[in-house]
Design a protein with these regions (language model features):
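Secondary-structure transition motif
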Residues: 1-127
Length: 127
């Protein structure tokens, strides 16, 4: 399961447009297609593109699905972290920021239900 974040070119920049809800599928070789047309998944600044966010398979305190690139509030640490997939660990990790330094805070553990989704990197934190 994944969600698709759509971006469009505006004034030489790529701007987050929204999350697509239909029309995308994954081909047998892993290429993303919109109906029958293969679409761009890299930011080349000349045309619109999309990013895939994998679902973690876990829900937050309110039952909302947690995706890669979501911002979650860790209720125990009282800190907002970004959810990322770490290839080295082959797991989803929580990335915390301290000034300009980012570090893995902890693994996203299914037994640990202390997180609440408060936004994502595209739209920022919800108030």
């Amino acid at each position: 399961m994944f969600r698709v974040a759509e971006f469009e070119k505006k004034g030489g920049r790529q701007v987050f447009k929204g999350f697509a809800v239909a029309g995308y599928r994954m081909g047998q070789r892993g290429q993303l297609k919109h109906y029958r047309k293969k679409i761009e998944t890299k930011d080349r600044r000349k045309k619109n593109y999309v990013e895939l966010n994998l679902a973690t398979g876990q829900t937050d305190l309110k039952g909302k699905m947690i995706y890669e690139k979501d911002l979650v509030l860790d209720k125990e640490e009282n800190q907002v972290c970004r959810v990322d997939f770490c290839k080295g660990y082959a797991a989803f990790v929580l990335i915390a920021s301290l000034l300009d330094f980012e570090f893995p805070l902890s693994f996203l553990d299914k037994r640990n239900q202390k997180f609440e989704v408060v936004g994502n990197i595209y739209e920022g934190k919800k108030k």
